[in-house]
Design a protein with these regions (language model features):
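Glycine-rich, N-terminal phosphate-binding loop of Rossmann-like dinucleotide-binding domains
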Residues: 71-73, 101, 151
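NAD(P)+-binding Rossmann beta1-loop-alpha1 motif at the extreme N-terminus of oxidoreductases
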Residues: 1-67
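Rossmann-like NAD(P)(H) cofactor-binding subdomain of soluble oxidoreductases
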Residues: 79-135
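N-terminal Rossmann-like NAD(P) cofactor-binding module of classical short-chain dehydrogenase/reductase
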Residues: 68-69, 98
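Interdomain hinge/lid region at the active-site interface
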Residues: 211-279
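Residues at the starts of beta-strands that form the adenosine-phosphate
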Residues: 8, 31, 119, 146, ...
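Internal alpha-helical scaffold of NAD(P)-dependent oxidoreductase catalytic cores
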Residues: 141-227
Length: 293
């Protein structure tokens, strides 16, 4: 069984996630090769010593690889899996294919169709930034993060063990979920929070048309709450497109909570206080701060 320190890893996508992964794996595997279709990204990856070698073509990048990590947007991952599927002459014996996509159902379905010499494992690290690009790569990005692994029925124990080793090497902790459960939970905790931030920003922009002083009052609370609205639209469209039903269900649940709050504002103040205190207590329990006032 191949140990991580002997593995040759290819990372497709020299952006925030792929670049951060390459930095975090430095010295922990035999070799890392980057792949990116963008010439500027390839040059930056080499100039910044993010990877020692980089290719423009996926096929060239996996010639000697033991592990292929797809660190590209969801839509590109699906295209890359299709490309791997087309190469019926196996790209490499026992090539472990791990993706970092933010949705899993469509990706796992595409992985099922990979040739037999590919050994796929679905993945999704629950970390990132609202900014994209290799210039924001950080070796500590994955540290302390939950890293979802979604093995297929065809995933070998060796491939899953190697995926676990990658997760541990970058300082994350693995959580095994099936694709449908992942997509439902990610909709509630990641995808809908982005939409809520967009709605908050849109409502504020509309209100500022009548009174531009609004932006002078928008301090740290507003900035923190609306931060996700700065996320790449192209990336988020891929995510929303491949997770429509769970996102819609989670969005309707949020609307129900907003309606509830509107009703509490019109009713008994004691009931409103009870609701707010309950939510505050849950927040403190789930995400303990250093101190609360």
């Amino acid at each position: 069984m191949l140990a991580l320190h002997n593995a040759r890893i290819t990372i497709a996508g020299m952006g925030l996630m792929g670049g951060s992964l390459a930095l975090a794996l430095r010295g922990k595997c035999a070799h890392v090769t980057g792949v990116d279709v963008d010439a500027a990204a390839r040059s930056a990856a080499l100039a910044g010593q993010v990877v020692p070698a980089v290719e423009s073509d996926l096929r060239a990048g996996i010639v000697d690889a033991d592990v292929l990590v797809l660190a590209t947007p969801v839509g590109v991952i699906l295209q890359q899996l299709q490309e791997l599927k087309a190469h019926t002459a196996a790209p490499h014996a026992a090539l472990v294919v791990l993706d970092l996509g933010s949705t899993k159902t469509e990706i796992i379905a595409a992985m099922e169709a990979l040739p037999a010499a590919c050994d796929p494992v679905g993945g999704h690290p629950m970390c990132g930034k609202e900014v994209a690009g290799l210039e924001h790569a950080d070796a500590a990005l994955y540290h302390g993060a939950t890293f979802v692994l979604a093995p297929l029925a065809r995933t070998s124990p060796a491939a899953l063990q190697l995926a676990h080793a990658v997760v541990a090497a970058v300082g994350a902790h693995a959580l095994l979920l099936d694709a449908a459960r992942h997509d439902q939970l990610a909709a509630a905790t990641s995808h809908v929070p982005y939409l809520i931030a967009c709605a908050l920003m849109s409502a504020a922009s509309a209100a500022a048309v009548d009174d531009d002083a609004l932006w002078q009052l928008a301090a740290s609370g507003f900035r923190d709450t609306s931060r996700l609205a700065a996320t790449s639209v192209k990336m988020m469209l891929d995510i929303l497109r491949t997770n429509r039903a769970p996102v819609r269900a989670a969005l309707m649940a949020q609307r129900s909570q907003i309606d509830r709050l509107a009703g509490l504002l019109e009713g008994d103040e004691a009931a409103l206080a009870q609701f707010l205190q309950s939510v505050r207590s849950e927040r403190m329990l789930r995400f303990p701060p250093a101190s609360y006032p």
